[in-house]
Each structure stands twice: as structure tokens, then as C-alpha cells.
Amino acid sequence: MKHSKYISSIAELSESEGVFTTAQAARMGIPRDALHDAVESGRIERIMHGAYRLVGSRSSYIDELVAIWKLTAPSKFTHERMQVSSWDGIAIGGSTAASLLGIGDFYLSPYRIYTPKRINSRNTATKFTKRDIARDEITFIDGLPVTCMERTIFDLVADAEDLSLVADTLNDAYDKDKQFDLAKLRNFFNSKYKEKRATYLYESLLLESDISKGVS
């Protein structure tokens, strides 16, 4: 192997990142040629252009999603993006977040990712939506920033998902998380819509769900 001296560095990067990017590898001094050589020799596999994983390492059904998220800031390591001070506002949301959180009956893909700035992508499996997500509105799942349950429920409504499906998702979230905060959910509606519209959407959702009709 022409670039055998990089094998240990690739293994180290894989150990810390799982799925890793070409730009992350470059920060560790691993050139593109070494990655190409590692693919050809069967040591690593390409998930998509610019993203790899070590062959033989534990793969996950979310590896493609992880790769897509990492490629939104390809040179940053995961631990850097997890820091509160470094929050870039890019989060997994909507139907994809619901799937990851284990609530409702939504599919993981097509992937829905919220970003503070518009991102144009040719990836038909991903829908980037311009939306502001605060750092305290997310949780991390396997290193991925995923909108919290309350935010996810709100975004499903904002994304015009079927209200009955969103109501079922709310039921699941309310049952699964004893700390689920209805007031927090209500505030998300209040922050986006005018008072009359916010009240209508929120109360319609509650009425469609199994949650006490007296809650408002």
C-alpha cells in the first residue's frame, strides 16, 4: 500500500468520528490519495462523495444521514460542533427527527435538515429547509443534533404534515417523555404565528390528540 503510513491515522480518525470526511482527514494530515488508496485496498468504504467509514467497523442505518450532516461543515470535528459556543444552527428536524426520537410513524428519509442559511443540494434524498434552531432546542443522538420533542412536534405542523399523524406523534412524545412540556410547545407556535393562528393550530393539534381537551 503506497500510503501505508497513514493507516494508523485513518484508524484513529474512524475511532473518534465513525463516519469521517475528506476535510477532516486533511486536518489530520491524511491526503486524498491516501483515502483513494485505502478505498481501493478495501480498508475504508465511500458512503458518498467526501465521506467514508472504516470497513469492518460497526455500521449504522443512519450513516448516510450522518455523512450528509457532516458535509454541511466538512472540516469540523463532531466534538467541535457539539460545543454550545460553536453551535452553527444546522439540525436534523421534522419527520427525520421524529423517526430518530422514536415517536410517530414517520420515515427517516427523505432526510429533513434545518439550516440558518439556504443550502442548495442535488441530493434528492435530502431536503434542506431554512429555519432558525436554537442550541437549547436540540438533543444529540449518536453525535447528531436532533430537534427536541417539543420542537419536532411544532416543526411537523410548520412543515404541513398531516395533522392526525402529528397528533399521533404528540401522543407518543407525551407518553414517552414524562417531562414533555406543553407550555414550551405552545411557545413555539406563539413565536412563529400571530396569536389567533397560533391558538388555532395548537388547540387543533391537542383536540386531534389523546391529550386532555382541557389543556391549553
Roles of regions detected by a PLM:
Residues 4-6, 14-22, 31-148, 159-187, ...:
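Short gly/ser-rich loop at a beta-strand->alpha-helix junction or flexible surface loop bordering the NTP-binding
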Residues 24-26:
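A short acidic, leucine-rich amphipathic alpha-helix
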Residues 194-201:
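Alpha-helical oligomerization segments
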